[in-house]
Every structure is written in C-alpha cells, then in structure tokens.
Amino acid sequence: MIASLIRSRRRSRRCVVYSVFLFGFLALWGSFALALVFLSDMYIGEDQISTQKAIKPIARSNYHVVVGHYNGNLPEDKKRNLTSEELNANLYAPHDDWGEGGAGVSHLTPEQQKLADSTFAVNQFNLLVSDGISVRRSLPEIRKPSCRNMTYPDNLPTTSVIIVYHNEAYSTLLRTVWSVIDRSPKELLKEIILVDDFSDREFLRYPTLDTTLKPLPTDIKIIRSKERVGLIRARMMGAQEAQGDVLTFLDSHCECTKGWLEPLLTRIKLNRKAVPCPVIDIINDNTFQYQKGIEMFRGGFNWNLQFRWYGMPTAMAKQHLLDPTGPIESPTMAGGLFSINRNYFEELGEYDPGMDIWGGENLEMSFRIWQCGGRVEILPCSHVGHVFRKSSPHDFPGKSSGKVLNTNLLRVAEVWMDDWKHYFYKIAPQAHRMRSSIDVSERVELRKKLNCKSFKWYLQNVFQDHFLPTPLDRFGRMTSSSNSSVCLAWTLRSSGIKTASTADCLKIFHKTQLWLYTGDRRIRTDEHLCLSVVQLLHTTSDWKIQLKECAGFDTEYWDFKPKIGRFQNRKTGLCLASPDIFDPTKDEFNPPIVQKCRSSNDRQNWTITEMSWLPEHP
C-alpha cells in the first residue's frame, strides 16, 4: 500500500510538472515561436545510407524567404564576366567526404574560394561546392521518433514526380532526381517527369542529359519546351503527360529525405481533396548544409499578396502538441513542393493558364482549394530540403518582372478575393491600372461551376488570424493630437527588423502608416504585426514600444477612449504617446513611447483618420 501511495505521488508530481511546463510553453509561444523547434525531437538519427551529423534548426529570420523560381532579371553586372564556357561547363567532380550526412562544406582553399566566387552568379548558389558533393549524398534522419514509428496503409496511390527546370546546375538537378529515387518506395513511384523550360546549357540538352538518365532505375521522361513558357505552363505540360494517381511537384534543387513520400500519399488516400505539402528544410546556398526546417509555421500572405510564413495561432499550437504528427492546416502554400490527386487537379482547373512565368500561382491555387471544398496542409512527418537562394539567376523573357507579377496577382484578386481585391489595389495601384486589359471571365465561370465559397468565408474559417481590414475594425492613419502632421508608422531597419516609429504623414495610401484598431482591441498592421510593449528591465516603469508578430499576449491589447483619443495598454496601464521631441531629420526613427497617463498631456491623444478602401457605390 505504501509503495502504491509513493507511485501515486510520483505520478501526481509528474502531472504537475507537465502542466506547469505546458502553461509556460503556451505563454511564451507568440514571442518565441522558435522555442517550438526545441520541443520537437532534436535527435538526428541515421538513415540507411548516412553517417550521423548534427544539424542546427534554421532561424526564423531566414524563413520568410519564398520558395521561388523566376524572381527577377539577373543584373547585367552579374552576367558580364560569365563566359559561354563557364555557363556550359559541367564540373561535377564529387569529393569522397564532402556534404555527407547533410554536412556543409565551408573550408575551401584560396583557389577554390576564388572559383566559387566567380561562378556563384551562374545559379545564385555555390556551384563549386554543389559540384563537389555527390548527387547521392547521405542525409540525416530528420523525422521525430513518432514519425519514424508510423505505419502506413497498403495500396497507397502511385505518384508522378514532376520537376521543372531552366538552366539548372547538373549537380543539383541530378541530386534532386536521385533523392527521389533513393528515398521513395519503388512501388509508389510511377515515374519522374522532367520538364525542360527551354534550357540552353549543353549538359541539359539532348542527347547528353538523356544518356545520363537512361541507366537510372526508374521511368524518367524528359519533356522539352520549344520556347520559354515559365514555371506555370511547364508544370501543366508535365501534368498532362503524367500517369500516376497523384501529381507531386518539386523544384529542381531539392533533396528528399527518408520517409518523405508515404505521408503525402496517405493523406490523399484518406481525403482526395487534401493537398499536402512537406515541411521545407533549408539547404544553405553557400555551404549546402542541410538544416531542419520548422514544423510549427504555416503559410499566409501580406498586404502585397506576397507569401509569408507565420507562426501558428496559440490555440492551434496547443492542439498540435497533442498530435505532433497530424496535418497542419495552412491558409496558403509556398507552391514549390506539394502533392495533389491527379483527377482532383483536373477537376479543380489545374493552374490558371492566364498566369505567366511565375508568381502568385501558389496563392491562386491555395484560395481555390480552400474556397472550393479542399484543404491545404503541411505534414510534419514529410521533409524535403530546398536550396534557398537570395536572388534568382533567371529572368522573365521579354517582359519586366513587375508587369508579370502584377498581372498574375491581379488575376488572383479579381477571381477570388471579392471586396478585398479593392484593398489590394490600394496597396498595389500599379496592378489596378492594368485591370481593364485583363480578362478573367473563364476563371470566374470556373469559380461559379465549382460552387466555391466567398473570400469572407475564407478569412473567417481558414485564415482567422489574418490582418486585412474588416467592418469590425477602425482602419486608417493614427495622428498625434499634439502635431496633426505626425503619424504613427513603422520603419524597416537595415537589419530587416520592422520597428514602430513616428513620421511626417504621407498624403498617399501607404502601408507603413496604415493601422487597424481591431474589434478585439489590438493595433495591427501589415506582416501580422501588433503594437505591443516590452519590459526592458524588471521594474514597473521601464516599458518600451515593440512591434512584434501577433500572439495574443495581454501586452498587445489597448483600450481606446475615443472622446479623448487615448490608447491605454491593458497590461501596464500606460498610455501610448508620441515622442517628447519629434525631429524627422534625425537618423533615429522617432519611436513612440508609453508613459503614465495624464489628461493634460496631448502627446498621449491620437486621432484615427479612417480611410476607405472599398469603392463608393451610388
């Protein structure tokens, strides 16, 4: 009996410890989203062909980079010193130990470093290092133990893996192909379809590449476009030739890890309208170190309709802790890596054929999937690495990148965003000016045919933590009563961090001076940011304004007294004020402050000048 009592007390203590841990975790989640990485299993095991290597989780600050393909024109100064011989050279010559186990290569000789620097612009990554790493290099076991122990149903659907490339490096393209072959069950891999978007590198042309791929132990098809068509149309070319039950799209500079495919196909077997994406791990563009990605972020978008990664809402994070292998609902997908039932892809309307080259197709497909009865998900048990480049080596043939992107995003807004398209046009007037020349009637008819839901439904049910204006919000500029020409603003520092500031009010509709005072009493702006306060020292008075990702902390909530225009922070009881001295010529950003509320201090009084983003109706 005594032993039983001791065991009972031990269990009780464990429960208390766990409860305290869970409470503390949830309290810190919003500000420290990266802490979730450490709660994931950080043990890096070995797959069947690798040596164990330590891999650091990728930093959140590096994770806003979009999985991209055709991001803009290669500057002339980068093209100038690249000879035809350099562009067409295939210098693949692997070293025995380079990159094994996902390790990075950083210790180059002076001669190697000089060559690496001179050829970096060819593909906007370290070509010398990539060419020195085996196309069948080993990778560590990335998955957490609960994922490794999972079993999957029999008779999973087969997949066609579609990889589009344009002037891709030989080593990264072959490494992508081999990783698919080596780490996919043979019975599930129907074929690999390579779509050449009019490459002009000799080693990618017929018959050189065809001869290289012919001995590989899987069915590989190469489709070559006779002109440059861009990612969107090239993917549709591949989809039209596919024979697998499922289409799996990958970029041409990826590495699949062990167990990457089964979770994707299982999810589609269970729900044919699910569109699952793997967790995207990071392959460093300089060292090619394989770094584990963050499993607790999901896709969103900012006011410019640019894809972004944002932390899960607290309630979702809490739920995910209870089932860390379960799918994560994502409002949008990055677009480079995902699987979709082939018949469902066709029923849903494939890609929008009116979109050109690259840009916005991931948002268009995400909105369409969600609004028309499907779901976009990220699967924590599926990991695929991707080389994240800081810029693109490719161009938009015969067109400016701005015009292509604005045209594509206009199509997204016109077809899927209903009233909120007008808000996008306010933020991107250059897109609005093209509106009369773009015909989206066929896609509008598709939306009607599929009986799709409204964008309001999408915001209320899918992207509930969005930061677009709604009728419940007060939206516009916040001006200081002490100086009506001074506006609350945010400023992008050289470090890439956005900070709260005050600035001369602009006469134009500019997102850096636009704020939402929401129905739940938060002051929000673009990029999922909230005006908050942070305590610098452990005193009751030393508080500072902070612009941070919204997380639902009580430091983010402000009670507004409209008669006097005062914002009082709920956590501290302090009032928002413009700086003591406003000097727009200073290098500093004239940050707002919080201080003890005083009725005589007009710097604590603010006026919300509401701005209309909807068109006026007669």
Curated annotation (Swiss-Prot):
GO BP terms, alphabetized: protein O-linked glycosylation
UniProt keyword Glycoprotein present: yes
Gene Ontology molecular-function annotations: carbohydrate binding; metal ion binding; polypeptide N-acetylgalactosaminyltransferase activity
Keywords of the record: Disulfide bond, Glycoprotein, Glycosyltransferase, Golgi apparatus, Lectin, Manganese, Membrane, Metal-binding, Signal-anchor, Transferase, Transmembrane, Transmembrane helix
E.C. numbers: 2.4.1.-
Co-factor requirement: Mn(2+)
InterPro entries: GalNAc-T (IPR045885), Glyco_trans_2-like (IPR001173), Nucleotide-diphossugar_trans (IPR029044), Ricin_B-like_lectins (IPR035992), Ricin_B_lectin (IPR000772)
Bilayer topology term: Single-pass type II membrane protein
Membrane-spanning ranges: 17-39
Region (Catalytic subdomain A): 156-267
Segments on the Lumenal face: 40-618
Disulfide-bond pairs as recorded: 147-381, 372-452, 487-505, 530-550, 575-597
Domain Ricin B-type lectin as annotated: residue spans: 474-609
Recorded metabolic or biological pathway in which this protein acts: Protein modification; protein glycosylation
Record region (Catalytic subdomain B): 327-389
Family annotation (Pfam families): Glycos_transf_2 (PF00535), Ricin_B_lectin (PF00652)
Residue ranges that the UniProt entry lists as topological domain Cytoplasmic: 1-16
This protein's domain notes: There are two conserved domains in the glycosyltransferase region: the N-terminal domain (domain A, also called GT1 motif), which is probably involved in manganese coordination and substrate binding and the C-terminal domain (domain B, also called Gal/GalNAc-T motif), which is probably involved in catalytic reaction and UDP-Gal binding.
Protein name: Probable N-acetylgalactosaminyltransferase 6
Native species: Caenorhabditis elegans
